[in-house]
Design a protein with these regions (language model features):
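Generic N-terminal amphipathic, Lys/Arg-enriched alpha-helix
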Residues: 27-38
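His-Asp-centered metal-binding catalytic motifs of divalent-metal-dependent phosphohydrolases/nucleases
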Residues: 66-84, 90, 94, 111-121
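Short polybasic linear motifs
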Residues: 5-9
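An active-site-proximal "capping" alpha-helix that borders the catalytic cofactor pocket
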Residues: 51, 90-100
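Short, Lys/Arg-enriched N-terminal segments with co-localized hydrophobic residues
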Residues: 10-19
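Divalent metal-dependent phosphate-bond-processing catalytic cores, especially two-metal-ion Mg2+/Mn2+ enzymes
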Residues: 20, 36-45, 49-62, 75, ...
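Hydrophobic, well-structured mid-protein blocks that either form specific transmembrane helices
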Residues: 97, 101-137
Length: 233
């Protein structure tokens, strides 16, 4: 495993009474590092690791189950429809990993439910049922904001052959899940179609504060981008 941060959070989870063997966090970290070894479009291993770190920090403040939050955060993209459409519906890879490591049926159900609630799906997006789900959803959405969010947006757009910006292509809003997944637009439009909608979807107070700061940074960046696009000095 690379880096010391997961170890810090893992030890803290154990100290707070987590009932699952702490080695599963190590194994999950190694597992997702291998799964995403060839992913460079914004949903890579380092995205997963950032979501894990942020989710567990939020979970501490919200008194949520750190083990459930940590595992759901680490595994949240393993069966993502964009990356593994053949396993998406039943969370096959997530379930197989958890069963292999002795997770209870209740924990597997909880983690799979959280993962199913994470994604932004336009007007069909859901509010997680549990505080653990809210922590993971907030962490995943926070990683789409700020400086990292900008970099990820352009990395994803470039890897999928999207135009950075075209003033003649207007953003589409109020899309449902099907429309959102099928929609092809520019990377700049993605700011309006998704990224600038995330702040108001945050569930926890700590995430709301971070989201506001990061959104302001993105708006300042986009203003500068559009000025430079027009050749303004």
């Amino acid at each position: 495993m690379t880096g010391s941060e997961p170890q810090v959070h893992r030890d803290r989870a154990v100290k707070q009474g987590s009932f699952m063997d702490k080695t599963i966090i190590d194994d999950a970290t190694d597992y997702v590092k291998n799964v995403f070894r060839n992913e460079f479009g914004g949903h890579d291993y380092f995205h997963t690791l950032r979501v894990y770190k942020t989710a567990t920090k939020i979970a501490e403040q919200e008194n949520a189950d750190l083990t459930v939050v940590g595992l759901a955060a680490l595994l949240h993209d393993v069966d993502d429809v964009k990356l593994s459409p053949e396993t998406h519906a039943n969370k096959d890879r997530t379930v197989a990993f958890l069963k292999k490591h002795g997770a209870s049926e209740a924990m597997i159900k909880s983690i799979c439910e959280i993962i199913g609630e994470v994604s932004f799906l336009g007007t069909d997006s859901v509010v997680p049922k549990t505080i653990e789900g809210k922590c993971v959803q907030d962490a995943d959405r926070l990683d789409a904001l700020g400086a990292i969010g900008i970099a990820r947006a352009f990395a994803y757009g470039g890897s999928h052959g999207r135009v950075m910006h075209d003033p003649d292509i207007k953003p589409s809003t109020n899309m449902n899940a099907t429309e959102y997944r099928k929609h092809v637009s520019t990377t700049v439009n993605h700011f309006y179609e998704k990224l600038f909608l995330l702040k108001d979807s945050m569930n926890t107070d700590s995430a709301k504060k971070i989201a506001e700061k990061r959104e302001n940074y993105m708006k300042a960046y986009l203003s500068e981008f559009l000025s430079e696009w027009e050749g303004l000095l």
